[in-house]
């Protein structure tokens, strides 16, 4: 019913922003996989609110509790359940918004669909729902690393009109985590922070683009026709809060090229190995990974909840003016980086198991 994702490596998330807690049940993880629990917590710390001056001041520890599925930090092959308790929530900040719809937020459409909505904290539409995704994604990352030394890295490419030109082939995690905006170019990162602070002082918000790569992805992942790898990646990433666009490889810029310019020529690399001279395909051809670097980008809109006066309506359809209260990110992108990585890792882990299930007998 909309809260589960994946086929064989499957997650189901639960909880609301201002409820008792949020979490995930992960099914299908292979048994006997050694899990670094500290690495799960480290990923949640990257997503955590209150981590810097450009994120929401909501102060949550986001300490993960693993309730099942592990013994001595090894997977049992049974469902892994993880939960994070909500501590610092203030429902009174949302009293005015109980019956007033925030423009471009999920309040209005949730009310249309269900006849009721959790206005306090945004309920299931809150980014706190992604805690479960990030926790499960941390396990997916460890599985991918164990099987194929696969690495998933994302960074902030653009904030509003400020864009960084980052070489996907050379970017490293230490460069991404060297500043609070998670842009590996330190000079551009400084400008991005200044822009976020500027819009925040004005009671406004801004969006941008996150770029993500997969190094050393297993070749052969993805299935024709409706389960193409990029199709599942698009669904995964477009399910994230505030996401508004997805592209892979050359993306929309590829439409300006001719076929002779865009085609990735194959180069001799030995039997059973495909290598290309260029990578306009972004590591996926015909919906199946070819082993080259997977390169994708996700666009995120400006945060919907802002402190400026906005015209809106209430649940009775009457015109109202709303200046939202509560604690919100002026820009979601710095905290969305681990969310993007997690969803990509979950898709790859799922397709890895599906590939083994269908084709593993002959490999």
Swiss-Prot record:
Entries under CDD domains matching the protein: Chorismate_synthase
GO molecular function: chorismate synthase activity; FMN binding
One Pfam family this sequence matches: Chorismate_synt
UniProt GO BP: amino acid biosynthetic process; aromatic amino acid family biosynthetic process; chorismate biosynthetic process
Binding sites annotated in the UniProt record for FMN: 124-126, 286, 301-305, 327
Residues the entry annotates as binding NADP(+): 47
Cofactor binding note: Reduced FMN (FMNH(2)).
Alphabetized PROSITE patterns for the sequence: CHORISMATE_SYNTHASE_1, CHORISMATE_SYNTHASE_2, CHORISMATE_SYNTHASE_3
Signal sequence region: none
Cofactor(s) required for function per UniProt: FMNH2
Cellular component terms (Gene Ontology): cytosol
Superkingdom of source: Bacteria
Alphabetized UniProt keyword annotations: Amino-acid biosynthesis, Aromatic amino acid biosynthesis, FAD, Flavoprotein, FMN, Lyase, NADP
Pathway: Metabolic intermediate biosynthesis; chorismate biosynthesis; chorismate from D-erythrose 4-phosphate and phosphoenolpyruvate: step 7/7
Reactions mediated catalytically: 5-O-(1-carboxyvinyl)-3-phosphoshikimate = chorismate + phosphate
Enzyme Commission code(s) on record: 4.2.3.5
NCBIfam families, per database record: aroC (TIGR00033), PRK05382.1 (NF003793)
Biological role stated in the UniProt entry: This reaction introduces a second double bond into the aromatic ring system.
Subunit-level organization: Homotetramer.
Family: Belongs to the chorismate synthase family.
Name of the featured protein: Chorismate synthase
Name of encoding gene: aroC
